[in-house]
C-alpha cells in the first residue's frame, strides 16, 4: 500500500590504510583493461583516467589529465618514501608530465600502457618486463592521501 520507509544510516569512517587498500583494489579491478586515449571505463582507459576513476571510487576527486593531477598533493623525491595509493608521475626530456601510475608497493606500479598492467618501478622509472626496457622516466611521487 501506501507505506513509506526511511533508512537512516551513518557513513563508516574508513582509516587511511583501508583507503589505500581500497584504491589498490579498485585499480586492480581494471587489470588488463585495454588502453584507450581519453577512456575511463572497463572497455578502455588511459593512465590519468585510471587514477581519476580509482580515486573517485574512493571518494576523492582528481582532475582529468596527468599534467593537472601532478599539481596536487605532497612531493616525495624517493621511491622508498612512497606508500600504496601514492601517484607516480613520469615525463619526457623537456620535463613535461606525460604519464601517471598508482604505486602498489615500493617496487610495483599499476598503470595503463597498452593495457592496465603491473610493472616494476625504481628510481629511474617503469621497467616493462615484456619489453625488457624502461618505458617511462620517473619525475615525482605525490601523496594525495593525508596520513
Predicted regions span which residues?
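...with weaker cross-activation on analogous glycine-rich loops/strands in unrelated enzymes
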Residues: 62-119, 124
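Active-site nucleophilic cysteine motif
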Residues: 27, 41-58
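C-terminal amphipathic alpha-helical segment
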Residues: 56-57, 81-84, 133, 143
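Boundary regions of SH3-family modules and the immediately adjacent low-complexity/disordered segments
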Residues: 1-33
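Aromatic- and glycine-rich peptidoglycan recognition patches
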Residues: 3, 10-13, 40, 76, ...
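Short helix-to-loop capping/linker segments positioned immediately adjacent to catalytic or ligand/cofactor-binding
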Residues: 34-42
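Sec/Tat-exported extracytoplasmic proteins
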Residues: 31-35, 58, 62
